Amino acid sequence: MHVAVALLQAGQRVATIDLDSRQKSFSHYVENRRCWVERSGLKLDLPTHYCVARGFGLRLDEIEAQEFAAFAEAISAIEQTHDFIVIDTPGSDSYLMRLAHSMADTLITPLNDSFVDFDVLGMIDQNTFEVTGVSHYADMVREARRQRRLVDGGLTDWIVVRNRLSTLSSRNKRLVGEGVEGLAKQLGFRAVDGFAERVVYREFFPRGLTALDHLNEDTLGGRPSTSHITARDEVRLLIDALRLPIDERGKRRAAARAEWIAAAAKPLETHDLLAD
């Protein structure tokens, strides 16, 4: 959600697709934001959103065909009219999850800062904590990137984002970091620090807010704290690290929109009210 809002604020036309039709966390986040806009009257950027429904049938091929048709319909509706499509995939393996990975220009894999989450990427030696092998998810991504190269010669920029980072140094934090860096060299992804463990991120969800929104008493229901400001800086650093291809046309749209909003917020001068 933070990536989508960052792109919207940069003047990009953004669509979002939720492939996790069981949990629907992404869809609920967008819907919460939409409802808060309607209830509060605030001007918050909203993406064009789609949620691909689960397929039903007796055979796996029937289910996959239904889901592919729904996904293809969503892509066809937005690919010519939007600059970015942000897709949320389920944690479980599925046909659409693999397809989305193989289509991605930028793949962001969030990883909680623990060896429990690290296990989906690689295996480690119990004594030395050195990486000894590649796990199932990393294998799947490697195959998806290979398929992408075969189709159009494109190279997926794979970024592993370490989330829920402790603000304090610890042996676990150091060892996980060393493991991620080791795998980055082996698998060809970029490792970047993401979000620290902050309560404010969980507080944003009910209203669909992000750390990049203009946070005040109207949006939050209270004054922003130092933690809110720190979270905003943290998100901006992450967005910069992603190196998303934001074009100049989008930047001009964002500047024009900001100028219009600033002008709309100012009271009219006397000479604007009276005709010559």
Language model feature labels by segment:
Residues 1, 68-72, 235, 239:
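Short, well-ordered alpha-helical scaffold segments within catalytic/effector domains
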Residues 5-85, 91, 216-217:
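P-loop/Walker-type NTP enzyme "switch/lid" segment
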Residues 10, 90-193:
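Conserved catalytic-core segment of NTP-binding enzymes
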Residues 24-25, 118, 202-203:
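A short beta-to-alpha transition loop/helix N-cap that caps and shapes the active-site region
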Residues 32-36, 126-128, 210-212:
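Short, hinge-like loop/turn segments at secondary-structure boundaries
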